[in-house]
């Protein structure tokens, strides 16, 4: 089995759509798509992913199924009362409500009490800090809390517990495994049992965080190792395949991570999205 993970094009997060650059990237991806031998396609319900997929699907004459759990993996983190986490997330926003809705929630999945934590009390006052995504941790904090990079111990870290990350992680990876089982590969603890060996290709048009979570599950590493160590550019393609070295037992291996051949072929600059400054003194890049 072959899996392709495609990140959406350069995003306008406020309106959940593509920027003009993102539209060019999506067109470049579509023009190159026949070289990827794309098979059965699935996509996130978020507008930026659906818009990206639409270029490819139209070019190839294909359709895609929308899967709600393919939306971005963005359980919120509430650091109010845990101000020591400002060391990890010094860029957390003040609580103006701007991150409580839209692409920062998981409809039908986010626990209502989580959102209530950021709402006003009986006096109309809310907590000082708003929600923050659970990655983009400062390197110095990560160095002091290496449990975040452990394949098992990340689950008991302060950040994981505060953000209910194991709950969301298990939900999403569980849905993913259900889909793989429908296509012949059933997860059993660490391995996949091959119930119907095949060389089918499944394509997922989705998001950076969600891709990191799913790939960490396939490669048996902490999600934080992927979230902190990888910046898959908009419209990049990552390829993983099964290896059945023992009859009936499959594991996954990454062949390509963040491939942007289509952008380079078209002369389109690769977006800086998801990256931070290459040098601290570069004020033009995100800190």
Residue ranges of model-derived segments:
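Active-site-proximal alpha-helix that buttresses catalytic centers in soluble enzyme cores
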Residues: 1-75, 82-97, 162, 166
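Active-site metal-binding loops of divalent metal-dependent hydrolases
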Residues: 9, 208-209, 258-260
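Conserved glycosyltransferase catalytic-site signature
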Residues: 50, 208, 234
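Phosphate-handling substructures
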Residues: 61-183
């Amino acid at each position: 089995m072959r899996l392709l993970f495609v990140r959406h094009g350069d995003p306008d997060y406020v309106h959940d759509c593509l920027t003009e650059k993102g539209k060019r990237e999506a067109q470049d991806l579509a023009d190159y798509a026949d070289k990827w031998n794309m098979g059965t396609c699935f996509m996130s319900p978020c507008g930026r992913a659906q818009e990206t997929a639409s270029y490819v699907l139209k070019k190839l004459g294909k359709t895609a199924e929308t899967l709600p759990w393919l939306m971005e993996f963005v359980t919120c983190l509430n650091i109010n009362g845990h101000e020591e986490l400002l060391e990890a997330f010094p860029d957390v926003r003040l609580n103006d409500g701007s991150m409580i809705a839209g692409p920062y929630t998981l409809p039908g999945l986010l626990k209502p009490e989580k959102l209530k934590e950021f709402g006003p009390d009986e006096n109309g006052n809310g907590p000082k800090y708003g929600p923050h995504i659970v990655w983009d941790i400062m390197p110095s904090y990560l160095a002091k809390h290496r449990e975040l990079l452990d394949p098992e111990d990340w689950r008991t870290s302060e950040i994981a517990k505060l953000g209910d990350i194991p709950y969301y992680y298990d939900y999403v990876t569980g849905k993913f495994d259900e889909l793989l089982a429908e296509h012949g590969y059933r997860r059993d603890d660490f391995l996949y049992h091959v119930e119907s060996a095949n060389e089918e290709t499944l394509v997922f048009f989705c998001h950076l965080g969600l891709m990191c979570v799913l790939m960490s599950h396939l490669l048996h590493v902490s999600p934080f190792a992927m979230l902190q160590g990888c910046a898959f550019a908009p419209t990049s393609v990552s390829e993983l395949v099964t290896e059945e070295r023992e009859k009936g037992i499959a594991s996954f291996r990454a062949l390509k991570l963040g491939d942007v051949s289509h952008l380079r072929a078209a002369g389109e600059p690769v977006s800086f999205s998801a990256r931070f400054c290459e040098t601290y003194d570069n004020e033009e890049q995100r800190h």
